[in-house]
Swiss-Prot record:
E3 ubiquitin-protein ligase involved in regulation of the Notch pathway through influencing the stability and activity of several Notch ligands. Its EC number is 2.3.2.27. Keywords: Cytoplasm, Metal-binding, Notch signaling pathway, Phosphoprotein, Repeat, Transferase, Ubl conjugation pathway, Zinc, Zinc-finger. It catalyses: S-ubiquitinyl-[E2 ubiquitin-conjugating enzyme]-L-cysteine + [acceptor protein]-L-lysine = [E2 ubiquitin-conjugating enzyme]-L-cysteine + N(6)-ubiquitinyl-[acceptor protein]-L-lysine. It is found in: Cytoplasm. Interacts with JAG1, DLL1 and DLL4. This is E3 ubiquitin-protein ligase NEURL1B. The modification Phosphothreonine is found at residue 199. GO terms for molecular function: ubiquitin protein ligase activity; zinc ion binding. The gene is NEURL1B. Pfam families: Neuralized, zf-C3HC4_3. GO terms for cellular component: actin cytoskeleton; cytosol; early endosome. It comes from Homo sapiens (Human). Pathway: Protein modification; protein ubiquitination.
Amino acid sequence: MGNTVHRTLPDPSPPARLLATRPCCGPGPERRPVLGEAPRFHAQAKGKNVRLDGHSRRATRRNSFCNGVTFTQRPIRLYEQVRLRLVAVRPGWSGALRFGFTAHDPSLMSAQDIPKYACPDLVTRPGYWAKALPENLALRDTVLAYWADRHGRVFYSVNDGEPVLFHCGVAVGGPLWALIDVYGITDEVQLLESAFADTLTPARLSQARFSACLPPSSHDAANFDNNELENNQVVAKLGHLALGRAPGPPPADAAAAAIPCGPRERPRPASSPALLEADLRFHATRGPDVSLSADRKVACAPRPDGGRTLVFSERPLRPGESLFVEVGRPGLAAPGALAFGITSCDPGVLRPNELPADPDALLDRKEYWVVARAGPVPSGGDALSFTLRPGGDVLLGINGRPRGRLLCVDTTQALWAFFAVRGGVAGQLRLLGTLQSSPATTTPSGSLSGSQDDSDSDMTFSVNQSSSASESSLVTAPSSPLSPPVSPVFSPPEPAGIKNGECTVCFDGEVDTVIYTCGHMCLCHSCGLRLKRQARACCPICRRPIKDVIKIYRP
């Protein structure tokens, strides 16, 4: 099934023999030595949470979601498939197995050389190549196979399915060890018997699908400098690696991967309001891995590994204004949850080459930055609305349905919106327009009474990724008691001084505590003390570390 033929290697260890494979190019077959011993996990080079069975064929991660990096005990030959069975999967974490190769001998590694994460900790170092398996493929008993060819390309397949090209530029001049990070929802994996993959003929190679569905998690959004190849570059080069190109029209997938970024003439989503102002565009300042259409209304990020794809609104949002965007391309699955944020920093003063891949890295800047993950993964073509209320609440809507409060921000200063566009064929963000509410407009009856259905997907702030779930439980932004109406219209804000506001943790006590050093006021004193005692405690609004909480007294 698919483009691979498995030739199972025997368990006994006979002398090395030669295996003739289907020629890739040239008149004769390529002959490669095959080791009889199946690969095993390296007994010493592993993360501190990894436990191996007696045969070093099964790796189990204990505790937390990280520190699960492992390697094979021997190098992997070119075209030799590393075959893994996902034995145990535990929902509740974010992200799944990471896999790839390294040119570094695990036997020479010390415990200090093995970090918590393969992505981004290892892949930002020379000689490491790895990416994430999409969570929708990380199912129990799934068999993953991946291999490298002599051109430095890495392919993978799931359950003997079609091969998917997901890496280029791997150094194949020396030995390569398999790198496997038992991460996130993946709890246990088992190394299976090796098999060799057929080399792909030019015709089959031209039909090989480039992976557009390896979305980075928050940990993967680092700088993948050693893996820089955009989809359109890969597709353009597939037929020129001493293979020639098969005659005929280009494959559909290649055309899809090279879709230009432009303002496509297609109808506006039916869920968006009919009358939207079209005065807002993306700012010219953007990440180096994202492109804008000529009118700066569409942002495209073709890289499946994400990259540095930050885009900003051209002007600050106005209090009471709703921003409407369309995520992805209709009919295609969106590649990952959208990262959205608010900042007081004028994008015009930023340098594009200094913009990070992970927007959380901006929280250390002196300006005001707030980052949130926009809830559940949207589908391609979904219309999202972000409403900045005069009181500072930022409300999220998906396809015209209110989904609760996303952020609480300081509206005493000019605030720009920014997004991290996820890569791949579906990596596109289109500005639909804005809608300004009238303060004098009376809200429809019942529009301010949030139901359970309206807030069943309330958002959480992006917390310190090294914290455990229990450590960050108090940092979760609780659901807003007020859900926005489908059409963004608002009542006048309450006069200052009438109410101090409710605690964003318990939603019961009155806000009477200042967080030091950021100065935000969003907690009652009891919740502030509880939060301060948590490991790596950080502000629910800006995520800066909490050094102290100070109770205030009002006259």
